[in-house]
Amino acid sequence: MAINKSEFSEVLMEINKVELDSKVETFIESEQEKYETSNGITCNYTPFCFMAKHDDEIIGAVSGASFFSEIYIDELVVKDVYRGKGIGTQLIKTVEENFDGQGFNNINCCTNGFQASDFYEKCGFELEFVRENKSDSRLNKYFYIKYLD
């Protein structure tokens, strides 16, 4: 049933907190895809994960997703005893190499003040902006971008 905006105030509805199950995810994806298509955009959401191992032990991982024309790094973790040994840098390079030549514009990531801001800058990321946490500066969010050739 189509609802005109002028009739919306007459629609009875309830809003509840629910688990994000497959039914809700399917609804969200379907509606987003329709809206994107109506605007001539293709999302192509594709999650990724690369894992570093040593002697069958996971020592690092990077995960995220590519969609629209961007790559988003959600998580980058290196086991504490292996930090500072180039593993994180190699994981970033692996992401770059995996998406090289596929038409992506940039890689985005976000980190907190207590995390690895210097690391991302060392890897060639530029700081776009900082979202300040007024109660705890360690939780300031640093938003980084790296443009691809």
Write out the residue ranges for each language-model feature:
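Conserved GNAT acetyl-CoA-binding A-motif
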Residues: 99-112
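Short glycine/proline-centered loop/turn elements that form peptide/ligand docking sites
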Residues: 88, 92, 113-116, 133-140
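Conserved catalytic-core motifs of GNAT/GCN5-like acyltransferases
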Residues: 108-110, 126-143
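Conserved acetyl-CoA-binding loop-helix of GNAT-fold acetyltransferases
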Residues: 84-97, 122
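Conserved N-terminal entry element of GNAT/NAT acetyltransferase domains
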Residues: 1-21, 149
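Hydrophobic adenine-recognition pocket in adenosine-nucleotide-binding enzymes
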Residues: 76-78
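Acetyl-CoA-dependent GNAT
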Residues: 14-74, 114, 131
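A conserved beta-turn-beta hairpin within the catalytic core of GNAT-like acetyltransferases
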Residues: 66-74, 83, 136-140
